[in-house]
């Protein structure tokens, strides 16, 4: 297992360009299964989770041509459905949560889709019910092999449009149901659909392939089924989570950074939440400029009560950045309550921050109060392990600001979501190296 060795306390300086959005790319890659024609995708991040999915597509028989580091063509004109029932697929699919999204396209085009119980981050119970209830509403039959933890849906007579009210605005669930619906007979209406930019991008891509999806950007999607889809060219948005991570790096290390080509219109509440912590952000065209700040102060509510930062489905604040907000707050002036509503164990990494000297009170699995040091006390370096992608990058940010040299183990978790992170940090002046065990 590899580790990062980080010498903290150094200010960074320079310009960084965010990678393509991981969560969008997972959906877009699965959508190539909907057509036998060639699909070209640009700005695909070169990270573990994406590369695992590309490998699975290749094993399914998709012809893959790598144009450059972040661009590929895919052609799913000779799919090997037998792979879905192989021991290799049970191994490969179970290691990646995003693999669940191959089920919708396979069900739509071939009448069946199978998946082992997916893996990914261990950040609480993340149900798959929304996916399969949607498929059942479209006319599929569902089966689950408890012994082998294997899910399957089949629709030998095809899928048929239906109205459905999702019990949760699941991003991956919405994406999966959209991809199943585009080739269904008739009209599908999805109420309480997720409307994140990732879903908007998927819908725009499918429409460019010949689908008929309206209501894009709202929580009511109407899909008129078509008989087939064609090829297209698509470019993945910059990763809003990585953009928020770079803002956190700049704030904690008192650095002046410019983040290029951020797609401001798709950042939602991210800039405003950081500003509530006192972080200065400047819009320069489609870039974010963050000046070096000696200190920053959390804004209380107008009645003087303590600020609460909580997550919610889009257009609410993304849960993927709450751990970074928590770390940034440790050096702010003031107090903030972090309320993680959507997952019940994403805050459990705070014990590592407390070991570093942060003042954090874990109220329960969903809430933590952070009392900022106002730069009066620097975090102390320590040895720690990365429990998941977002906690991992948050601990890395804390280590970059800490006094002394920190070691972070289990960094494959960080590699799952962040492309070439140590070299990109070094280009800004960070003292970080990868140690292979």
Identify the meaning behind each predicted range.
Residues 1-437:
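Short, structured segments at the rim of ligand-binding sites
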């Amino acid at each position: 297992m590899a580790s990062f060795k980080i010498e903290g306390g150094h200010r960074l300086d320079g310009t960084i360009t965010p990678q393509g959005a991981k969560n969008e790319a997972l959906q877009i890659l699965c959508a190539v299964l909907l057509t036998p024609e060639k699909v070209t995708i640009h700005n695909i991040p070169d990270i573990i989770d994406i590369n695992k999915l590309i490998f699975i597509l290749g094993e399914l028989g998709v012809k893959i041509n790598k144009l450059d580091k972040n661009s590929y063509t895919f052609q799913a004109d000779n799919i090997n459905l037998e792979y879905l029932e192989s021991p290799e697929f049970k191994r490969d699919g179970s290691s990646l949560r995003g693999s669940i999204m191959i089920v919708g396209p396979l069900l739509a085009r071939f009448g069946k889709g199978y998946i082992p119980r997916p893996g990914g981050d261990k950040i609480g119970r993340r149900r798959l019910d929304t996916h399969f209830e949607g498929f059942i509403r479209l006319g599929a039959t569902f089966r689950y092999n408890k012994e082998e933890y294997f899910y399957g849906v089949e629709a030998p007579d095809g899928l048929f449009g239906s109205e459905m009210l999702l019990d949760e605005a699941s991003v991956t669930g919405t994406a999966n149901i959209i991809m199943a619906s585009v080739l269904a007979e008739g009209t599908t209406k999805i109420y309480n659909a997720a409307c994140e930019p990732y879903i908007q991008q998927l819908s725009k891509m499918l429409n460019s392939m010949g689908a008929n999806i309206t209501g894009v950007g709202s929580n009511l999607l109407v899909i008129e089924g078509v008989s087939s889809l064609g090829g297209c060219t698509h470019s993945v948005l910059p990763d809003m989570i990585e953009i928020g991570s770079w803002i956190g790096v700049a704030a904690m290390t008192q650095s002046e950074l410019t983040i290029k080509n951020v797609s401001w219109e798709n950042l939602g509440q991210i800039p405003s939440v950081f500003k509530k912590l006192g972080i200065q952000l400047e819009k320069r065209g489609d870039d974010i400029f963050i000046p070096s700040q000696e200190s920053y102060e959390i804004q209380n509510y107008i009645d003087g009560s303590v600020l609460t930062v909580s997550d919610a489905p889009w257009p609410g604040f993304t849960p993927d950045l709450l751990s970074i907000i928590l770390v940034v707050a440790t050096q702010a002036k003031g107090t903030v309550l972090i309320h993680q509503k959507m997952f019940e164990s994403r805050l459990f990494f705070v014990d590592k921050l407390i070991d570093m000297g942060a003042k954090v009170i874990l109220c329960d699995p969903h809430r933590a109060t952070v009392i900022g040091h106002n730069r009066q006390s620097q975090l102390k370096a320590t040895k720690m392990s990365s429990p998941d992608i977002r906690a991992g990058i948050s601990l890395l940010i804390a280590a970059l600001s800490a006094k002394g040299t920190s070691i972070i183990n289990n960094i494959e978790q960080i590699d799952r979501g962040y492309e070439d992170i140590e070299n990109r940090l070094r280009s800004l002046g960070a003292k970080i190296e990868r140690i292979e065990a």
